[in-house]
Swiss-Prot record:
Protein role: May have a photoreceptor function. Binds ss- and ds-DNA in a sequence non-specific manner, lacks photolyase activity.
Originating species: Ostreococcus tauri
A molecular-function term among this protein's GO annotations: DNA binding
Required cofactor names: FAD; (6R)-5,10-methylene-5,6,7,8-tetrahydrofolate
Any one Gene Ontology BP term: photoreactive repair
This protein's UniProt keywords: Chloroplast, Chromophore, DNA-binding, FAD, Flavoprotein, Mitochondrion, Plastid, Transit peptide
Name of this chain's protein: Cryptochrome DASH, chloroplastic/mitochondrial
Amino acid sequence: MGRTRVVIWFRNDLRLLDNACVARAATLASESSDVEVVPVYVFDETYFKPSKRGLARFGAGRGKFTLECVGDLKTSLRALGSDLLVRCGKSRDVIAELTLTGANDRTIILTQTEVTSEETEMDVAVERATRERARGGAASATMERHWGSTLYHIDDVPFDVTSGLSDLPDVFTPFRNKVESKCKVRDVIPAPTANELGHVPASVEGFEWMPKPSDLPFASSEIAMDCDKRIKDCLDERSVLDFKGGESNALARVKYYLWESDRLATYFETRNGMLGGDYSTKLAPWLALGCVSPRHVVSEIRRYESERVENKSTYWVIFELIWRDFFKFFALKHGNKIFHLDGTAGRRASWKRDEKILKAWKTGTTGYPLIDANMRELAATGFMSNRGRQNVASWLALDAGIDWRHGADWFEHHLLDYDTASNWGNWCAAAGMTGGRINRFNIAKQTKDYDPAGEYIKTWVKELAEVPAAYIADPNQAPRELRDRIGLNYPNKLALPRRDFTEMGSPPGPRRGGGGGGRGRGRPGGSTPNRGTKARVASVYDTVYG
Ligand SMILES: Cc1cc2nc3c(=O)[nH]c(=O)nc-3n(C[C@H](O)[C@H](O)[C@H](O)COP(=O)(O)OP(=O)(O)OC[C@H]3O[C@@H](n4cnc5c(N)ncnc54)[C@H](O)[C@@H]3O)c2cc1C
């Protein structure tokens, strides 16, 4: 009889609690003392390559956060008597190297099911490479994919998984109504206890190694240096939170937001804020890297509801987590269309390239204070409120008419909570490319409603510190005498094109190309053909949100 090695290939599931792969490894290890468990994480160079539009996809802030997540997982695994092997390179090569090759040996690779093409293509490459290596020595290698990133398990959702979720609604409300009425959230899977994963085998070397920023395959040495700097000292004092990666910090944040501060009980009223740590949960970065599962968050909310209070706020965090699920399943259904210029609806619109506008948007110098403040916050801290994201996305895509994928790329580079399905799904929707109505935000009115005194704007746009609230949405409209007195030095609003939204139609028949994907080419979830109809075009209208 040969040996059995179980490789836990951690990706966006950097936790021990409620992790189906970890639980499965513990079960396999309990079946025989000959089973050895090797937990591994790879900083895969694929994610660090520039996007199709030339922007480095993995930024310094996310580099720091991910290093912290991986370090925290390593510490937790060591506390159990196991460890985490950390590598940089290609997952395919690293995991193939871990494959046993002796006669009758078997290697079982456990990994979380992913929904987008780059990740699923990576699975296939790992599977192929490990099989080939095992076969060379008359051994065997298999991969098990375990679902784990959503609140509702894919096997429980009331949609046709076998047809690639072809009956999944393309808008949120019917999706939510169906999942809430038809399925239950499964129980949280307990974390393993000491020694359940056994000790890592002595034959595998390199467990003592943890990469530094300069070891990560960043697109440039400047990004690596910036990452190093962020680790060593410089938390911007205006950051909403000192985000530190890792499961222990994620669980501490859940505990704080629910039990220690009771902020959960007022979430509905505060969620549109932009300043401070507590207007929203700030769980997104940890959820994106899988340091905490949405199921754990919801089970804690349910406990809070039974022990403290149940109200609209406690429900609303669950509501938001269902949005997160929606975008995961939406990505699975539509495959690479979420990366295409004409989106999942196949809508044609006149997008343009304008380097001046794009640069102003990225650097927070558009002359629109709410946009500039949010964009500066993102670049400095890796975070932006949901209110801010809606506004800056609407401005870039719908007001400026810039190819919205440049915006999605920029977010991918900067956001600590970057999640492929949430980011590209939200951008595609914000650009009006998922079908249905188009929600264009009135930036001046949004400023008045959500930052009437300009407190948030002044935090990030220092040159507006002296501008009275009455002129905060458009400082250059202040009387000349006032502008001179305060020495206002802020750009005029960029001139933007007038856009005709009725032109956004969907072409009849299947997409004929020209949209140009943002990432890889695979189609993991399949897709439905575009049905460009007059009714659909007629349903497109410009809602200016107040
Ligand atoms: C253009 C654009 C891009 C976005 N990109 C991302 C992204 O890459 N990663 C990401 O996690 N969120 C993304 N969002 C969604 C949302 O803005 C963030 O999840 C939220 O602001 C994070 O703050 P929070 O954790 O305090 O959220 P809370 O308000 O506390 O909400 C709780 C959780 O619900 C989930 N959630 C809330 N709103 C959404 C939403 N619209 N879509 C998906 N999940 C949601 C998040 O996991 C969040 O942590 C994007 C939104 C827009 C408009």
